[in-house]
């Protein structure tokens, strides 16, 4: 096992980093990103992969040899999650269904965070049995929506104390459920700023 964890910039997709650098104007080319002055600079292939990802997502284009943000890229730069998940938000907004967008926000927030389900060693079978009540065998996305609907929608938004009780009995991490709820709220606010209609 390595003595130190590899720096995050060397082990994750650079799409979001490249997008941010382009949006604030500190980079226009892959060379600008590579030469930026990171403590642990990424290699050229990782930077190139980041640009390719943004091209596939239609977040960037080229004008007179320079990389520019598209309308989609400017929207993505304002969404505080992985660029691929952010693109899901934009596509859901384009579909024109406020309820669809609300569901997508719940799913992308779930995918952005650590799974809130807990399986303590001494109660693994009980936790699995309880979690199976939320499961949809056709889709993990629908499972996430089931958890959200039953915890945060069924009886109204629970107080912190009520959420703690739910988490204790349903084997959810209270902290991760709070993070999920907070990220959904943040994404809903961002959608309003982008003039997306959320149900």
Report the location of each language-model feature.
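Second RecA-like catalytic domain
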Residues: 1-199
């Amino acid at each position: 096992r390595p003595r130190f964890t590899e720096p995050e910039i060397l082990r994750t997709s650079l799409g979001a980093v490249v997008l941010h650098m382009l949006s604030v104007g500190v980079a226009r080319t892959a060379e600008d990103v590579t030469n930026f002055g990171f403590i642990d600079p990424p290699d050229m292939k990782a930077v190139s992969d980041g640009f390719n990802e943004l091209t596939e997502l239609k977040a960037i284009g080229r004008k007179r040899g320079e990389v520019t943000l598209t309308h989609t890229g400017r929207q993505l730069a304002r969404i505080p999650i992985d660029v691929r998940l952010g693109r899901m938000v934009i596509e859901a907004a384009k579909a024109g269904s406020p309820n669809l967008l609300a569901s997508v926000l719940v799913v992308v927030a779930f995918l952005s965070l650590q799974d809130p389900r807990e399986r303590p060693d001494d109660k693994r079978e009980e936790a699995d049995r309880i979690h199976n009540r939320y499961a949809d065998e056709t889709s993990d996305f629908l499972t996430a929506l089931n958890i959200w609907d039953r915890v945060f929608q069924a009886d109204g938004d629970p107080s912190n104390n009520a959420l703690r009780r739910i988490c204790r009995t349903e084997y959810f991490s209270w902290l991760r459920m709070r993070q999920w709820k907070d990220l959904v709220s943040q994404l809903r606010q961002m959608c309003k700023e982008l003039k997306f209609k959320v149900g």
